[in-house]
Amino acid sequence: MLSPKKTKFRKQHKGRLKGVCSRGNRIIFGKFAIQALEPAWVTSGQIEAGRRTITRIARRGIKVWIRLFPDKPITKKSADTRMGSGKGDPKFWVAVVKPGRLLYEMGGVPENVARKAAQIVAYKMCMRTRFLKT
């Protein structure tokens, strides 16, 4: 699972998901891509599940580029804790995704294989996605 090696601060504000993606929205590395159409937080587990799905479906010859990184810590308090006494401890990491952001890029396989992989990965993501090709 992906997570930063070191951060300047342990905890972050929640923030808001508004606007569209202005960076990371063009195909650079591969021939095909999966693009987000809605704002969402994508966990490191979801990113890894998508990567494993793509490599499993396409078998040999595929090259996958993960175009997002989970760099936002999400904190949680345990269930039996009373209110107050500060913010909880970081439990997992998410990537903040805005509409238009590329999630994965693929290359080295025919379009029908890449399209099938993208369709199955879309079920594992928490937002609507679409398939792009150059």
Swiss-Prot record:
The keyword Iron does not apply. GO terms for cellular component: chloroplast; mitochondrial large ribosomal subunit. One of its GO terms (molecular function) is rRNA binding. CDD domains: Ribosomal_L16_L10e (cd01433). It comes from the Eukaryota. InterPro entries: Ribosomal_uL16, Ribosomal_uL16_bact-type, Ribosomal_uL16_CS, Ribosomal_uL16_dom, Ribosomal_uL16_sf. It is found in: Plastid, Chloroplast. Pfam families: Ribosomal_L16. Its main location: plastid. Keywords: Chloroplast, Plastid, Ribonucleoprotein, Ribosomal protein. Disulfide bonds: none annotated. SUPFAM superfamilies: Ribosomal protein L16p/L10e. GO terms for biological process: mitochondrial translation. The keyword Metal-binding does not apply. Transmembrane segments: none annotated. Belongs to the universal ribosomal protein uL16 family. HAMAP family: Ribosomal_uL16 (MF_01342). Part of the 50S ribosomal subunit. PANTHER family: 50S/60S RIBOSOMAL PROTEIN L16, LARGE RIBOSOMAL SUBUNIT PROTEIN UL16M. This is Large ribosomal subunit protein uL16c. It comes from Welwitschia mirabilis. The lineage of its organism: Eukaryota, Viridiplantae, Streptophyta, Embryophyta, Tracheophyta. The gene is rpl16.
